[in-house]
């Protein structure tokens, strides 16, 4: 994709993510006052940070493909986790996610729990296709899922804020949820690697040509 069109695409994506964030705050704060502890919201915030950083590289006339590669790998896997875990739990038992009678707008729900992953997939496939980029360590996903599980348990015990009460009923359930989250992230990680094995994009070829001429 041409650099100018890439920059415009990134700005549109950022505006969309910010609008979803604002909508989520307006709709969900009365129902979930502490919903910024949820993986869904954390994923949204990290994506916003990523696109702010990547737009900065666009404005500095740098090739976004060569920057923040591990961060993009991480948010791709995290977005995949949010999508699979949410719809999976919703299919199994809606009561594990929502209290009886609670309603979230359908478009907002889909944007939060699938829309962000679709954006990340389009980013890799069409906007900034990365060929054999730098990847996150698989160990990172285990460490982060473990830290997150322990953190929400501590938050519940110290402040009585129940982020995922169904997941904290027993140590066995906590271990299962942590391990499932880890495996889902790893699956997303390898999907990203698979998508990265396609042929090089025009931007990468141009960048490599420039580097060759300079050197």
Residue ranges and their predicted role:
Residues 1-86, 90:
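N-terminal helical submodule of small eukaryotic multi-pass membrane proteins
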Residues 2-5, 157-197:
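Membrane-interface transmembrane-helix boundary segments in multi-pass integral membrane proteins
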Residues 12-22, 146-153, 178-191:
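Hydrophobic core of alpha-helical transmembrane segments in multi-pass integral membrane proteins
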Residues 20-40, 59-68, 88-108, 125-138, ...:
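Membrane-lumen (extracellular) interface motif
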Residues 76-80, 84, 112-121:
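Core segments of transmembrane alpha-helices
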Residues 106-118, 175-179:
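Membrane-interface loop-to-helix entry segments
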Residues 137-146:
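Central hydrophobic cores of alpha-helical transmembrane segments
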Residues 200-215:
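Non-transmembrane, juxtamembrane loop and terminal tail segments
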């Amino acid at each position: 994709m041409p650099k100018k069109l890439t920059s415009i695409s990134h700005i549109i994506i950022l505006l969309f993510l910010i609008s979803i964030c604002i909508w989520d705050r307006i709709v969900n704060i009365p129902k979930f006052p502490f919903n910024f502890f949820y993986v869904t919201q954390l994923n949204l915030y990290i994506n916003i940070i990523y696109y702010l950083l990547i737009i900065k590289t666009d404005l500095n006339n740098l090739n976004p493909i060569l920057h923040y590669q591990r961060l993009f790998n991480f948010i791709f896997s995290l977005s995949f986790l949010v999508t699979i875990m949410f719809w999976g739990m919703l299919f199994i038992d809606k009561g594990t996610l929502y209290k009886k009678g609670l309603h979230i707008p359908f478009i907002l729900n889909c944007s939060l729990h699938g829309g962000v992953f679709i954006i990340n997939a389009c980013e890799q496939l069409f906007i900034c296709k990365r060929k054999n980029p730098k990847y996150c360590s698989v160990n990172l996903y285990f460490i982060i899922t473990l830290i997150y599980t322990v953190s929400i348990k501590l938050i519940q015990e110290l402040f009585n804020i129940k982020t995922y009460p169904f997941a904290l009923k027993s140590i066995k359930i906590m271990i299962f949820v942590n391990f499932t989250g880890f495996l889902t992230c790893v699956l997303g990680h390898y999907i990203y690697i698979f998508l990265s094995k396609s042929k090089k994009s025009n931007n990468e070829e141009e960048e490599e040509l420039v580097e060759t001429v300079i050197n």
